[in-house]
A protein has these predicted regions:
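N-terminal beta1-alpha1 ligand-phosphate binding loop
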Residues: 1-23
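Short loop/helix-cap segments at secondary-structure boundaries that form the rim of catalytic
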Residues: 16-20, 37-38, 59-60
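Anionic-ligand binding patches
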Residues: 2-6, 40-154
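Short linear Ser/Thr-Pro motifs
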Residues: 9-11, 30, 97
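Short glycine-rich, Thr/Ser-proximal phosphate-binding strand/loop in the N-terminal lobe
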Residues: 24-39, 115-121
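Generic alpha-helical hydrophobic packing signal
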Residues: 15, 28, 109-111
Length: 154
């Protein structure tokens, strides 16, 4: 039996990143309920989210290699996921303006028999952002499917 590589995400950015290494994979978005997940730190939270997404898809694809990921922005202990509205995106961007924060990405890989997960974190510093820049940016579709309302890759 040939196992497949499955990306447990509907994220266009995750698809793009994985495509840099291989085009031989399938995409199956997870139906994992993130709302009930809690943790004592943002890094632990994102690892649990990635693991939950990965295992939810792996349960439907035994024997395949499933990759699940999640990212959160940590601003002094406050977790920013994807903004829920224009005002939420503006609030996040104002908090990030001129400040340093952490970005945590959880990664989980499972083949059904073994599951491994880890977190990678980095510090990001924003230059100050004007209200006009925030208004222009939030008027686009860019911030609404990204943790912290921004994508560092552009």
């Amino acid at each position: 039996m040939n196992s497949k590589l499955i990306l447990a995400s509907g994220s266009p950015r995750r698809k793009e990143l994985l495509s840099l290494y291989t085009t031989d994979f399938e995409i199956h978005a997870s139906d994992f309920d993130e709302s009930a997940v809690t943790a004592d730190t943002p890094a632990r939270l994102v690892e649990k989210l990635a693991r939950g997404k990965c295992l939810a898809v792996a349960a439907r694809h035994p024997g395949d290699l499933v990759l699940g990921c999640d990212t959160v922005v940590d601003v002094n202990g406050e977790v920013f996921g994807k903004p829920h509205s224009v005002e939420d995106a503006k609030r996040m961007l104002r908090a990030l303006s001129g400040a340093t924060h952490q970005v945590h990405t959880g990664v989980c890989v499972s083949d059904g028999a073994q599951t491994k997960s880890f977190v990678d974190s980095c510090r990001v510093t924003f230059f100050p952002i004007s209200e006009e820049e925030i208004e222009r940016y939030t008027a686009t579709k860019e911030p609404y499917d990204k943790a912290g309302a921004y994508a560092i890759q552009g």
